[in-house]
Amino acid sequence: MTLEQYIESVNAKYKLGNATEHTFRGLLEQLIESIVPEIRATNEPKRIKCGAPDYILTKKEIEIGYVEAKDIGDKDLAGIKKTGNKEQFDRYKSALPNIIFTDYLDFHLYIEGVFITKVAIAEIQNGTIVSLPNNFA
């Protein structure tokens, strides 16, 4: 699956109007494993001490990272709002060496609790998810 195929698939489900955060989980798993074939993305792995991140990323059976996904359009991917994702994100950032927070369109990478970078591969425009190829091409 390419990034464009992923975005098209996410958009098709999003436009139905009844999708939730969980609707897109399989698509993200497919994307990760397609663009980085040596990585396995396990959706809904076993709970760990700090909580239950949505995905665990493994390479040769070694845990190398985690992904926490929120619903498309989540306004707190930085985890700064006390009424948003702050408590959960702070807990994950302090316990997990590599974690990505995403709303399936925007991805924020933290290493050892420090924000490293973010990339938006698409955005919502007039109820449609539109690719931002200049950000990833």
Please describe what each predicted stretch is.
Residues 1-98, 106, 112-117, 121-122, ...:
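A short, conserved, highly charged catalytic patch centered on acidic carboxylates
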Residues 120, 129-131:
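A shared catalytic/ligand-binding motif for oxyanion handling
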Residues 131-137:
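Non-catalytic C-terminal interaction segments of nucleic acid-processing enzymes
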